[in-house]
Structures are given as C-alpha cells and as structure tokens.
C-alpha cells in the first residue's frame, strides 16, 4: 500500500541519513539509538496499527534490535548483502503463495532487486561498501518487511524469523 511505502521510505531515509552522518562524523551512541527507536516507533505503530500496546512495544524493540544487528554484522565482504538477499528472496517467493500477501512479496523483492547490483561490487574482493548508512537502512527495511509480513499473516512473520536466523545466530 502507499502508506507502507511512505513508512519504509521516510524511516529508511532517516536512519540512513543518521548512518551517513555517523560514517562521516562519529555521532554519539545515544543520538543514533534515539533516531533508530523513534523511526522504529513510527514504523511499528503504522505497520501494526490494530495490535495491542504490548505487541507494538515489543515490535519497536525488535525493529531497533534488527537495525543494530544488521549494522553489527556488516564487516565481511558480501555477508550482509547475501544474507539480506536470502531473506528477501525467500520471503518474497513464499508470500506469493499466501492469499492477500502480495504486498509483502513486492516489498521484499524490491530490496532483493537493489541488493543484487550492490553485491556485484561488494563480493570479495569488495570494491564497494555499504557503511553504516547502508547497513542501518537494510536493517530497518528488513525489520519493517518482517513486521508487515507478520501483520498480513502470522505464518509469514514466522517465515521471516526463520530466514533471519543466520543474522541472529551469528551475532
């Protein structure tokens, strides 16, 4: 839906901008965390608007954690991009077979399409790097796609969680 698109673009742009400023000037941790949690709050409320307050609170923490998790994992050539591509392709293809979840597929496959050309240049030996701006954006986007998927169908939320396990286990 257009509203979900605005949430992804607005929140993604904000966290990417903070990541870019952090790459350039080394921002204080409290400021980065504040922006990540503020963006996560808006996204969680927007994507899970009918959910109980406890679920939204947990979603905010989970989304903020996903942003930091992906940023933390970024360091090896091709690692984050390949894992994110796997999550997006897996969720995108599986959601094609779930009635009413075509939007989940679209949002997941958009990131997959963006990651493929990036990976061409990020594959070892890397000639192009995502930095904090790219890593936090990918973390935010992956987290939002997971929340959106869970909001559309609980089974898709479980699929997203399973596909994210390489990030979780490696942390």
Predicted regions mapped to residue ranges:
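Divalent-cation-assisted or electrostatically stabilized phosphate/pyrophosphate-binding catalytic cores
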Residues: 171
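"…together with the soluble PPM/PP2C metallo-phosphatase catalytic core" -> "…together
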Residues: 1-168
